[in-house]
Structures are given as C-alpha cells and as structure tokens.
Amino acid sequence: MNKSFADFFNDQVAFQKEVNEKFGYNAKVENIPEDNVEVAKYHMLALMEETGELVKSDKRWKNYRNTHYDKSNKLEELSDCFITLFNVAMYSGISAEELELALTKKMDENIKRIREA
C-alpha cells in the first residue's frame, strides 16, 4: 500500500460526500472541504468519543487495574481518531495540501526545538 497523505484525506472527502448525500447533517453542506462550524463541531465531539475509546483500549497508564491492552483495538481506535481529525479539517475548510504542509512545518519546528534544547 503506497497511499499518500493526500490520498487518505481525499478518500475521506469522498466518503463524507456519500455520508452527506445519504444521511446529511443538521447543517447544510455545499462543498467539501468547506468551512462549516456546525459540522466541524459535530466531528470535534466525535473526536472526544473516539479518544475515549482509544484510552479504553490500553489501560496500562492507570495506577491500578492496569493490565488491559488490546493492540488490534488500539489500532482501530487510532485510525478512527485520524479519520475524525480529517473530518474536522475538511469541515474547517482545510485541504489535504494545507494540512500536510502544516503538519510538516510543525514536526520540523518540534525537531528543531528538541535539538536546540
């Protein structure tokens, strides 16, 4: 599998277009990506839910009752988090190219910070 970042993002854009056509949202969606506060808010709330499911998949961080670890479920929940973040970006009017550029810039800044510390 040699999908690029933009391929994953654009696949999710296509999927969201299908979701919108079949089910819709409580707010009108004209074009994706688009800046749509209501739909972005929906996906931010969904991200909170997905993050909770991710935490449940690996309880080793806890002080007690900390033996539960389900790697396959953790991978699934991490994937859900990434997909939902793509949705937040696309309903914030952010394209795949903009997001990839911002990620690259931020990662470069983090590397520079740690190397200069």
Predicted regions and their residues:
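Flexible "arm" and connector segments at domain edges
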Residues: M1-A117
